[in-house]
UniProtKB/Swiss-Prot annotation:
Family: Belongs to the N-Me-Phe pilin family.
Protein name in UniProt: Fimbrial protein Q
GO biological process entries: cell adhesion; protein secretion by the type II secretion system
Name of encoding gene: tfpQ
Subunit structure comment from the entry: The pili are polar flexible filaments of about 5.4 nanometers diameter and 2.5 micrometers average length; they consist of only a single polypeptide chain arranged in a helical configuration of five subunits per turn in the assembled pilus.
Compartment annotation: Fimbrium
Note: Moraxella bovis can express either a Q or a I pilin, the inversion of 2 kb of DNA determines which pilin is expressed.
Source organism of this protein record: Moraxella bovis
Gene3D superfamilies membership: Glycoprotein, Type 4 Pilin
Cystine pairings recorded for this chain: 136-155
Pfam family, one: Pilin
Length: 157
């Protein structure tokens, strides 16, 4: 009598089914992880802008996106000379909320470009009050798959 060598077809089919079930469970969790890590990354990239804004204000200059037109302005480094966001996860970066004329203002980044489709369109806002205190808020209403768990530590919705 010959001994069996290898696997039967049914055994291989069972293994493939198990792998398929595990992949179906893992993929959505992985997508959520990617969305949160990308959101956290953009908050970190805006932190560099916050530091540059504080430094410009300390020197008596007006923070600006793009090349400074004169000695009273300071480029905070979040955009290229062409005006596009340096980060491949941001579709736009803006200065608003008074443009730091009195020390208060906002840095706003809209997620887009290479950001995960679930978070594209969300707006991350770093707001500075006149005393120099920064707060982070995220508006995910424009993002098609936004979930509250994408909000990184230190920010609020």
């Amino acid at each position: 009598m010959n001994a069996q060598k290898g696997f039967t077809l049914i055994e291989l089919m069972i293994v493939i089914a198990i792998i398929g079930i595990l992949a179906a469970i893992a993929l959505p969790a992985y997508q959520d992880y990617i969305s949160k890590s990308q959101t956290t990354r953009v908050v970190g990239e805006l932190a560099a802008g916050k530091t540059a804004v504080d430094a410009a204000l300390f020197e008596g200059k007006t923070p600006k996106l793009g090349k400074a037109a004169n000695d009273t302005e300071e480029d905070i480094g979040l955009t290229t000379t062409g005006g596009t966001a340096r980060s491949n996860l941001m579709s736009s970066v803006n200065i608003g909320g008074g443009a730091f004329a009195t020390g208060a203002g906002t840095l706003e980044a809209t997620l887009g470009n290479r950001a995960n489709k679930d978070i594209a369109g969300a707006v991350i806002t770093q707001s500075r009050d006149a005393e120099g205190v920064w707060t982070c808020t995220i508006n995910g209403s424009a993002a098609p798959g936004w979930k509250s768990k994408f909000v990184p530590t230190g920010c609020k919705e």
